[in-house]
Swiss-Prot record:
GO terms for cellular component: cytoplasm. This is Nucleoside diphosphate kinase. Major role in the synthesis of nucleoside triphosphates other than ATP. The ATP gamma phosphate is transferred to the NDP beta phosphate via a ping-pong mechanism, using a phosphorylated active-site intermediate. The gene is ndk. CDD domains: NDPk_I. Gene3D superfamilies: Nucleoside diphosphate kinase-like domain. ATP binds at K11, F59, R87, T93, R104, N114. Homotetramer. PROSITE patterns: NDPK, NDPK_LIKE. It is found in: Cytoplasm. It comes from Shewanella oneidensis (strain ATCC 700550 / JCM 31522 / CIP 106686 / LMG 19005 / NCIMB 14063 / MR-1). It catalyses: a 2'-deoxyribonucleoside 5'-diphosphate + ATP = a 2'-deoxyribonucleoside 5'-triphosphate + ADP; a ribonucleoside 5'-diphosphate + ATP = a ribonucleoside 5'-triphosphate + ADP.
Amino acid sequence: MAIERTFSIIKPDAVAKNHIGAIYNRFETAGLKIVAAKMLHLTKEQAEGFYAEHSERGFFGALVAFMTSGPIMVQVLEGENAVLAHREILGATNPAQAAPGTIRADFAQSIDENAAHGSDSLASAEREIAYFFSAEELCPRTR
């Protein structure tokens, strides 16, 4: 098993419903350590930059509008096979298809407002972490 880091967002819908603590509890209960975290209210430019890979897709404008509609939590999680572990905790992108007990099944209302984002690969995690955090902001958890 490999110790990895992954990137996570708690989206505006889940922040507005005060689910931050419950979601953090899910991460930690699953063995993922939070090594960096901050609350942000994304600008349009930040959201467009982060989601640039989707800029030609029909849902891009709605995605940017949603992600700038309120505060978000961004965090870096660390643990064994963190990318896969985090995605399993999140559940399917569409909460209607998410397994019971996953974050999206429990806290999301729709595929558009689906509570959370997680990196889909180590390469994505590295890029997404660097978008929001400097190396100095990452705090190794040795205890």
